[in-house]
């Protein structure tokens, strides 16, 4: 499985 990492501030 692949995961997209996003940082939302």
From Swiss-Prot:
Keyword check for Disulfide bond: yes
GO biological process: defense response
Record flagged with keyword Disulfide bond: yes
Residues in the signal sequence: none
Keywords tagged on the record: Allergen, Disulfide bond, Pathogenesis-related protein, Plant defense
Coiled-coil residues: none
Function (record text): Basic thaumatin-like protein. Does not exhibit beta-1,3-glucanase activity with laminarin as substrate.
Family: Belongs to the thaumatin family.
Misc. comment: On the 2D-gel the determined pI of this protein is: 9.5, its MW is: 22 kDa.
Subunit note: Monomer.
Protein name listed in UniProt: Thaumatin-like protein 2
UniProt lineage: Eukaryota, Viridiplantae, Streptophyta, Embryophyta, Tracheophyta
């Amino acid at each position: 499985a692949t995961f997209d990492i996003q940082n939302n501030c």
